[in-house]
Amino acid sequence: MSGGQAECAGRDDSKKIELAEGEQEQNMSNTIVTLKKGEGRTIKSGGLWIYDNEIATITGTFKNGDIVLVHDFDGYPMGRGFINQNSKIRIRMMTRKADQEVNEAFLRMRVKNAWEYRKNTVDTSSCRVIFGEADFLPGLVADKYENVLVVQCLALGMERMKETIVGLLKEVLAEDGIEIIGVYERSDAKERKKEGMPIVKDFIGPEFDTNVEIVENGVKYLVDVKDGQKTGFFLDQKYNRLAIQRICKDKRVLDCFTHMGTFALNAGIAGAKEVTGLDISEYAVQQATENAIRNGLQDVVKFWAADVFDELPKLEAAGEKYDVVILDPPAFTKAKNTIKNAMKGYREINIRGMKLVKDGGFLATCSCSHYMDYENFTKVIHQAAVSAHKRLRQVEFRTQAADHPILWSAEESYYLKFYIFQVVDEK
């Protein structure tokens, strides 16, 4: 399929599902994958990944991306998943029912269930409709920005089902009166290289304006779904941004790693008297400034380009103090072997942030790395408080928004940790 992706802009979309159905029929395989003795406990407890070193034998022929049947060492059927020998995650499970066909009806059920869940849990005007493993569609992300969809395929098997799923997404949303006017593919994550797949950024179907205005928590943003980070916007912090509104009225606020100005603008709309947003990216600062103007907050919320690690010591040396400091850094680690260095980074930035908070003010701090787990992140914050000679009173602890559900049997689905603390000087 990858050979045709670069040509998809403006193509006729009307036969997409029929073509994809044909591909899906070829996607099924009679291949049986048998696991080693003692392996398979993760799958039996609800996990979705089988690694290359867990497999004993493969019987039958297949192509990468095909659906195969998985047995445990004793020959007990464990379900079906798609296989890719280019990936260390050799099989991603699609169903634990060995007799269940992974066809269009199956995919429609998965998409429908994902959408019904969002309707019951979040504001769906802009939200993550499909969150990979947590929606039992491993390797697939689908974000809705008003009437635009952005899809991302991170696994080969899902890549081969992509066009069917896009068609089903449109159908399911249309049942609720939502007409999708455009779909853009943002399959440009590094994970694709591990799957042996090329980077893809392109329209699926007719071209459209890729700058989309959304409204979240009463704040307007212009989202660039083509060139913005991830799929264009960080939807996972939606309700964490709302949470900081309660502590920002009439306050002086510093928002670090502001990106598009999301936390800063939530502070501004809540009635903060002065908000400063910092980000190392000139492009991000430009976007944030435009968003401030869009919301009529340009006189209250200001942004400038700066390296936060360099700027915070300068602010401390200048005697600056803030009622609220917000720390929303990028992931300092994306692998287990870099956790120690990441902990140093989180510790340093939290020390710097705490020192800028007025006595009795507030610190909002978070980590978006799965590998920086709750225990390590909490430990780092405590160490930072000791080093900064501050006492912390926890206001609340939060995770990612409910449209990024945490599947307890898939620990990789839990990644965002978000705290609000009151910061008190040692006395």
Model-derived features with residue positions:
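Short Gly/Ser/Thr- and charged-rich N-terminal loops/segments
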Residues: S2-G10, E21-E23
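Non-catalytic accessory regions of SAM-dependent methyltransferases
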Residues: K15-E146
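Short histidine-centered catalytic/ligand-binding loop motif
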Residues: R92-E101, V150-K162
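A short, charged
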Residues: A105, M109, N113-Y117, T121, ...
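Non-catalytic substrate-recognition/targeting regions of SAM-dependent transferases
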Residues: G132-D143, K162-F233
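Rossmann-like S-adenosyl-L-methionine
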Residues: D202, P206-K427
